[in-house]
Amino acid sequence: MDYFKMFINGETVDAIGGTKAEAIDPGTGKVIATFAYGGPEDANAAVDAARKAFDSGVWSNMQPAERSRILIELSDLLYEYIPLLARWEALDSGGLITRTSFDVITVIGGLRNLARYAAYDFKWKEDLPKSRNGFVAGLNYIRREPLGVCVGIVPWNFPFLSAMYKCIHALAMGNTVVVKPASDTSLSMLVFTEALMKTRIPKGVMNIVTGPGSTLGKALCTNPKIDKIAFTGSTEVGVDIMSMAAKNIKKVTLELGGKSPNIICEDADLDFAVDGAMCGTFLHSGQVCESGTRIIVHEKIYDQFVEKLVARTKALRIGYQMDNATQFGPIVSKKQLDTILSYIEIGKKEGANLVCGGKKPDDPKLKGGFYCEPTIFADVKNSMRIAQEEIFGPVACVIPFKDYDE
């Protein structure tokens, strides 16, 4: 069975305490690999490496054009790793193999664009008009510099894409990074280290650590040697991170939960609107922070819309994420599946009308995995919990409205 190590100071390393964790395929419920599972000591070692690399100037003082060339070399190299990264991403996260391949390609394009922008379009220095005050002889300008050590804490729904977008922005501007993937979906970033070691990126500039957020993640957020934290995940954890960062006055970027509305008016093209609603709700089995799970439909077209939405949803092919024919895959973990199923029960008790799905699939081939049928509730009221709380799963709440003022 494959075993993956962390990446600190240019080397793959075991957890200092020797701890390992199992990676589980959500499509089968089976263990597919093990990986190093670190703690505070590993977090601090990664931060020390990033701090030393930044302060040395080996990356932060490098000419932007040279940094750009190195990052573009990495993007070129990643083309060779598309099949490998996409495979492990799909196996580990439950994302469809057809989508995870696209995620890697998206990262490659983003890396190239950002590298070029940082080198040739970004204004590192900007002259300003002289101020009309007593300092008439002064020269006014803005000089922009890399910030320092940036920590990226990554969600489990799009692990490689989310992690790399936190990293490549920071790297392009001359910062050093420590990234922590989610414990449920760590493998793609650990596989990525194979490519990383083939580049000219200096040691310590990029570090990848894996472990529980309660210990390793906390150690990263409270380490005084960091300069910035970027986090994507739940609102509850975001509150904790902001609180921890405040104690050392660190910059924070938070991308947290959502319960987005998808508003369908009476003059909408119904077929087009149904397509959009399905994508907005059921992409990656509903495990997307910007999912439009509150589908708010004008009462004049409400019944017709619900009928079309249910028919199209029932036609989705539920299956294993590694099958190219699958349109709707598994949930990331049993814990998340249980959360989704509990919300479906809440919706029933609240009086919402369950018109589609609402349970695990009956297909015996899917028995071992963490699957939930795409689910639709009709006649949902805004006061219901399923309409107010983020479920983070394939549960659509279709809510009628009468007029635009409402």
Where are each of the predicted segments found?
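A structural signal for short, well-ordered beta-strand elements
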Residues: 22, 36, 60, 266, ...
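Short helix-capping segments at alpha-helix termini
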Residues: 198-202, 316, 320, 384
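Terminal low-complexity tails and localization/encapsulation signals of metabolic enzymes
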Residues: 1-35, 69, 73, 105, ...
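ALDH superfamily catalytic-core signature
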Residues: 236-381, 400-405
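Residue-level signal for inorganic ion chemistry
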Residues: 29, 67, 89, 174, ...
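Rossmann-like NAD(P) dinucleotide-binding subdomain of oxidoreductase/dehydrogenase enzymes
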Residues: 123-272, 401
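Residues at or immediately preceding the N-termini of alpha-helices
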Residues: 26, 40-43, 64, 82, ...
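Glycine-rich loop-to-alpha-helix module at the N-terminal edge of alpha/beta enzyme cores
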Residues: 32-122
